[in-house]
């Protein structure tokens, strides 16, 4: 089972990716992890990527596709894989198709921007332990303080409202067009497209995925 997860940052893809990996026994493939592994292993593609990154440049789609092909040829991907955070753009999706990397299911997590801003802007973190709270869904016992140590909670830079809105803007500009792209692919019977309401409770979303994917 080969799956692509689509959705804005904060839409709940990461949580459901963990669920799908456990249920179907397939690895999650993230481009960041792949790059780090290839560089560490000193593969030809890894060395090429390192040279580009050392110059402060972005790794080309061609290189990333090469890494994806290399990764999905490994034994643990025989039963399928889960792509999260890739492809991000139409050219990347086209390059994947040209490289013969086919997928069975594309799952879009649909969550309104304002809900995502509320989700992320409400997060508070205890830096020393990594404990995460949420002002609305999981508030600390004492405002702004960690339950166990009483130490101050902080807002991560990634969760600041202006940062979240910027990331959402990038998503809508670059990645949202993939929704139309993969809906067209589904119409041509090249994959199945599923749109999930990501505002529902985590276990409800997991159950829905389970019934959709079988």
Swiss-Prot record:
Q: Where is this region: LID?
A: 122-159
Question: Annotated pathway, please?
Answer: Purine metabolism; AMP biosynthesis via salvage pathway; AMP from ADP: step 1/1
Detail which positions bind AMP: 31, 36, 57-59, 85-88, 92, 156, 167
Q: This protein's superkingdom?
A: Bacteria
Keyword Cytoplasm listed? The answer is yes
Short name of any one Pfam family annotated for the protein: ADK_lid
Q: Which GO terms describe its molecular function?
A: adenylate kinase activity; ATP binding
Q: Which InterPro entries match?
A: Adenyl_kin_sub (IPR006259), Adenylat/UMP-CMP_kin (IPR000850), Adenylat_kinase_CS (IPR033690), Adenylate_kinase_lid-dom (IPR007862), P-loop_NTPase (IPR027417)
Region NMP: start and end of each range? 30-59
Q: Name one GO biological process term.
A: AMP salvage
EC numbers on record? 2.7.4.3
The UniProt keywords, alphabetically, are:
ATP-binding, Cytoplasm, Kinase, Nucleotide biosynthesis, Nucleotide-binding, Transferase
In which residues is ATP bound? 10-15, 123, 132-133, 200
One GO CC annotation: cytoplasm
Q: Where in the cell is it found?
A: Cytoplasm
Coarsely, its chief localization is: cytoplasm
Functional description taken from the UniProt entry: Catalyzes the reversible transfer of the terminal phosphate group between ATP and AMP. Plays an important role in cellular energy homeostasis and in adenine nucleotide metabolism.
**How is the subunit organization of this protein annotated in UniProt?**
Monomer.
Question: Which family, according to the similarity comment?
Answer: Belongs to the adenylate kinase family.
Q: What protein name is recorded for this chain?
A: Adenylate kinase
Source organism: Pseudoalteromonas atlantica (strain T6c / ATCC BAA-1087)
Q: Quick one: which gene encodes this? A: adk
């Amino acid at each position: 089972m080969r799956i692509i997860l689509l959705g804005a940052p904060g839409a709940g893809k990461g949580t459901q990716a963990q669920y799908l990996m456990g249920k179907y026994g397939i690895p999650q493939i993230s481009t960041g992890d792949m790059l780090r592994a290839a560089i560490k292993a000193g593969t030809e593609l890894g060395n090429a990527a390192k040279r580009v990154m050392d110059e402060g440049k972005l790794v080309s789609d061609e290189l990333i596709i090469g890494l994806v092909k290399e990764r999905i040829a490994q034994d643990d991907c025989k039963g399928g894989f889960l792509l999260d955070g890739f492809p991000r753009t139409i050219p990347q999706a086209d390059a994947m198709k040209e490289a013969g990397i086919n997928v069975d299911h594309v799952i879009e997590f649909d969550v309104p921007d304002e809900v995502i801003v509320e989700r992320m802007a409400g997060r508070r973190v205890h830096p020393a332990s990594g404990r995460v709270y949420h002002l609305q869904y999981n508030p600390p016992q004492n405002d702004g303080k960690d339950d166990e140590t009483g130490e101050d909670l902080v807002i991560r830079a990634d969760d600041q409202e202006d940062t979240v809105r910027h990331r959402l803007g990038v998503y809508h500009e670059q990645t949202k067009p993939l929704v139309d792209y993969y809906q067209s692919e589904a119409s041509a019977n090249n994959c199945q497209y599923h749109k999930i309401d990501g505002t529902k409770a985590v276990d409800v979303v997991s159950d829905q995925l389970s019934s959709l994917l079988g």
